[in-house]
């Protein structure tokens, strides 16, 4: 099975922009964790796209495909081609180890119409990069890589519709989507729409309104302001009172921003495995978030660090999945554990930073569990886990 892992930030999504070091590091951490998990599974061949400004990495099983036709040293062709209609084979490759394991063909739970999946019986193991340069069109390159794959695992922010566009492209090319369905992706792209959707279905949420309707919160402050389609803590700010918030809003404008009351509580997250409206709560995570000069800074967290709250968080995980049946595979839920009970902040229909330590925390391979969802029901996969807290450190590079 050839899997194209498309990590947006490190994989070419910012080719014509300066690469933010923090975002690139966070993307690389998630990418490396996922690739490590996939690489040990039998019959899996991995291809990545890579911004050529970044180092390739040190994994022993690299092969390299260069979009400018610069062949890697001693290139070797792939032994097998994908037998999916319209597929293409990368131009040059370099591999190391081999294996005789091959996957069994299986149907996709979420794919475009009209193409029968036949699988890829490859005996060559490798992890490949398609190097993208500033002169390249990342979306065209990704389309080619999607066509050359059997399945695609998107890791992209909701910001600007990037994840939704990538999801649509995968399905348009009739490939297996190893991620959430378009309806869930589009809903989660708006924090405001997500909160309203969950609240209408009885899920406890943090009160959220458009910035222009801050009076509806009926509180003098403090307030938290963030982009409606933002990812992580990017551009999330604290305002101590209404006057400061109003002055800032007058300068920046209210469009595209949401406001929430600041709630003193524990910033936690949930790592879920989802399918057809059901959820398996893999881990309850602690998040490290600090406020520096009235800006929220995400410093990482501890996967499995809030397992003591599992009994309280499992009903929330179930309720979120039931309210958003388009969640499939891995999904993250951010919440605040406040004195009156936990409240959901947002839903992430993609890998989150907690995935970096998730495998170590679970003592299991989360990528393997997710791939099993292609053929098996969630209830068949679920089993007891002995969870050990594992940290993810994201101290800012400029700290």
Language model regions located:
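Nucleotide-activated donor-dependent transferases that construct or modify glycoconjugates
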Residues: 1-23
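Conserved N-proximal alpha/beta basic substrate-recognition cap immediately N-terminal to
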Residues: 29, 33, 37-38, 45-72, ...
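Glycine-biased, low-complexity coil/linker segments
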Residues: 80-82, 112-114, 124-125
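Peripheral (often C-terminal) accessory segments that flank ATP-dependent C-N-forming ligase machineries
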Residues: 116-123, 338, 369-399
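Active-site nucleotide/adenylate-binding loops and adjacent lid/helix of ATP-dependent enzymes
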Residues: 170-175, 181-265, 276-279, 302-315
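ATP-dependent carboxylate/phosphate-activation module, predominantly the ATP-grasp catalytic core
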Residues: 260-325, 337, 348-374, 393-395
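A short glycine-rich, hydrophobically flanked beta-strand micro-motif that places a catalytic Asp/Glu
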Residues: 327-339
């Amino acid at each position: 099975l050839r899997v194209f892992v498309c990590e947006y930030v490190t994989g070419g999504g910012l080719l014509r922009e300066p690469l933010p070091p923090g975002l690139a590091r966070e993307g690389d951490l998630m990418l490396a964790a996922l690739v490590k998990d996939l690489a040990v599974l039998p019959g899996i061949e991995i291809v990545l796209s890579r911004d050529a400004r970044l180092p390739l990495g040190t994994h022993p099983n690299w092969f390299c495909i260069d979009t400018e036709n610069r062949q890697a040293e001693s290139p070797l062709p792939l032994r097998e081609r994908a037998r999916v209609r319209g597929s293409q084979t990368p131009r040059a490759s370099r591999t190391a180890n081999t294996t005789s394991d091959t996957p069994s063909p299986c149907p996709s739970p979420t794919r475009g119409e009209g193409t029968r999946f036949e699988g890829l019986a490859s005996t060559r193991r490798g992890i490949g990069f398609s190097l993208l340069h500033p002169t390249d069109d990342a979306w065209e390159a990704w389309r080619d890589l999607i066509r050359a794959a059997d399945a695609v695992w998107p890791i992209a922010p909701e910001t600007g519709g990037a994840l939704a566009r990538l999801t649509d492209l995968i399905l348009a090319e009739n490939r297996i989507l190893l991620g959430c369905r378009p309806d869930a992706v589009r809903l989660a792209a708006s924090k405001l729409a997500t909160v309203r959707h969950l609240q209408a279905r009885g899920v406890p949420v943090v009160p959220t309104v458009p910035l222009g309707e801050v009076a509806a919160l009926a509180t003098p402050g403090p307030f938290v302001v963030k982009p409606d389609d933002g990812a992580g803590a990017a551009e999330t700010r604290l305002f101590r009172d209404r006057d400061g918030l109003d002055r800032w809003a007058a300068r920046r404008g209210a469009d595209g921003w949401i406001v929430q009351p600041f709630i003193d509580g524990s910033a936690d997250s949930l790592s879920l495995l989802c399918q057809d409206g059901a959820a398996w709560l893999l881990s309850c995570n602690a998040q490290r978030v600090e406020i520096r000069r009235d800006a929220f800074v995400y410093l990482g967290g501890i996967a499995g660090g809030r397992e003591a709250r599992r009994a309280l968080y499992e009903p929330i995980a179930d309720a979120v999945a039931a309210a958003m049946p388009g969640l499939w595979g891995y999904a993250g839920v951010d919440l605040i554990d406040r004195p009156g009970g936990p409240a959901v902040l947002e839903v992430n229909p993609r890998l989150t930073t907690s995935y970096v330590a998730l495998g170590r925390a679970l003592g299991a391979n989360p990528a393997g569990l997710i791939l099993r969802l292609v053929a098996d029901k969630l209830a068949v996969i679920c089993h007891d886990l002995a969870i050990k807290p594992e940290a993810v450190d994201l101290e800012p590079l400029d700290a």
